Amino acid sequence: MKKIEIPALYKKWHVDRGYELESLFEQLTEQFDIRSVLYPGCYVHITPSFYIPRAVYVDMELPAKKFFDDPSVLEYIESRKTYKEKSEVTFYHQSYEELIDEPRESFDLVISQYAGFISEPTKRYLKKGGVLMVNNSHGDAGLASIDKDFNLVAVFGQSGISEKNLDQYFIPKKKTEVTTKYLKDLGRSIGYTKTASNYIFEKVT
């Protein structure tokens, strides 16, 4: 059998740094029956494709475009996938704030990690009942927590996905009126009394 090499950029940014998030994606797909994912600001984080058959990636960076243009990346995904179907991977070399050529409400999952306020401009592509997986590195989880279109349904931490004590999250440490404008003007996360590494919101409207 042909040995499939780990793509260099993926190895550098995710394998070597221990940031593949395999456990998170495995649990997400099992618990929420996810078959399609949109990942804006992905750079070269292809781990979702190991667990989800249809993946659409969006990033402005030129190295990301070169990465996804390389046929060996899809070969690597095929070598690590955990489902029977053929992997379907699409990449858009553009800003996630611009419209992409995908139907509205066509994805089971939208991912927001380290690329700013992703949830607001991309939620149009998320199905009602679909989920947003988001961290709070740039304040996007905080933004989702006050968005009427989203409802917090789980968090992810060292013990895995949990649905316990969700009302204890997104309570500001300081007495601050948290609004969309406040978070966007700040451009980063604020301090909360209880936190998780990732938050899972269901799109309810």
Model-inferred region functions:
Residues F25-T82:
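SAM cofactor-binding core of SAM-dependent methyltransferases
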Residues G129-G142:
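Conserved beta-strand signature within the Rossmann-like core of class I S-adenosyl-L-methionine
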